[in-house]
Amino acid sequence: MALVSRNNNMRTLAKLAAPLATAGTRTIVDNKEAIWNGVKWIWGKLPKGKKGKNGNGALIAHPQAFPGAIAAPISYAYAVKGRKPRFQTAKGSVRITHREYVSVLSGTNGEFLRNNGTGPNNDFSINPLNPFLFPWLVNIAANFDQYKFNSLRFEYVPLVNTTTNGRVALYFDKDSEDPGPDDRAALANYAHLSEISPWAITKLTVPTDNVKRFISDTSSGDPKLINLGQFGWVAYSGPTAELGDIFVEYTVDLFEAQPTSPLLESLFRESASSVQTRMGLPYFSLEVASATDLVWQARVPGTYVVTIIFNSTVGGLTPSISGGGTINSSFSVSTAGSSAYVANITIRVNANLSLSGLTGATNAQLFAVRAITENAVQVV
């Protein structure tokens, strides 16, 4: 009979292998879960500003900086990109989404300066046919009767470096006829306000409602009923300089197609009564009207062809432009009794177009229309 040698240790190890493997796996899983829970706990304690997917949007940590403060780096650049307008149609309406340039924001020697310091308070009333805010949209809105903003946001993009002092502010007022803030105390009381240093970017979202309003194609409507409100900006405690640019982004619905409203401005002043009559868009305003001088102010950036006719007892005139404007080409005819001046001009920021050296100037009328510099005024 042959002897057989048996080793029960192998059978015992085989029986223990499965439980040991399961226990080891559970231990690894438990350890991973503990590590993951620890990472989540640390992540939850981090400030929200440091939780970006990458470091591009994270705030810079600085000693002694208050939470929410924005640190000033040595230099900072903002990319301003063009955007294609989007059009949608539905149930007799047209929806437009676009971004436009509004104006440069200027400061003056530490003063409290609102809307660059010139013009009526309601220049920037929110209505699609206002060329001060929507210079591109007016060409489309002139073909409709009603509008409704679905979204509206203004953005300030700086032009200055991080050593520039002062502050800039964007504000919104629901009443388009309110006079606007005259000091910092009044500015601080606005419910819709965004203030920041002039070297940083800021945005102001305007609250919109679901109300259809009429487009302002005449001067006889009640501004409180036809406008969504008014927008404005302020610079204070800073230098005399162009601090930054203002842009507007919007989505607006236009309703009820109509014959095109006048896009040519006609501004007539009758000297005996000093009454001014305007038809069309408000590109220019008559600031000075005397027997020797006529001065119009332009505040909407762009290029125009301007025609001015007036009465005078003696021929002769001297044209000039001051501020942020350039006369590209011009032509004039002046005789005793009546005179005419035609010019192609470009307005970059508030500018005054003047006719001086007049004698006995009386009734005056200005016509203005958007153009390009190639629409040169010349006599061949």
Curated annotation (Swiss-Prot):
Signal peptide: none annotated. Residues 48-53 are annotated as: Involved in encapsidation. It comes from the Viruses. It holds the Pfam family Viral_coat. One of its GO terms (molecular function) is structural molecule activity. Residues 93-254 are annotated as: S domain, virion shell. One of its GO terms (cellular component) is T=3 icosahedral viral capsid. Its main location: virion. The keyword RNA-binding applies. Residues 1-92 are annotated as: R domain, interaction with RNA. Keywords: Capsid protein, RNA-binding, T=3 icosahedral capsid protein, Virion. Belongs to the icosahedral plant coat protein family. Capsid protein self-assembles to form an icosahedral capsid with a T=3 symmetry, about 32-35 nm in diameter, and consisting of 180 capsid proteins. Homomultimer. This is Capsid protein. The lineage of its organism: Viruses, Riboviria, Orthornavirae, Kitrinoviricota, Tolucaviricetes.
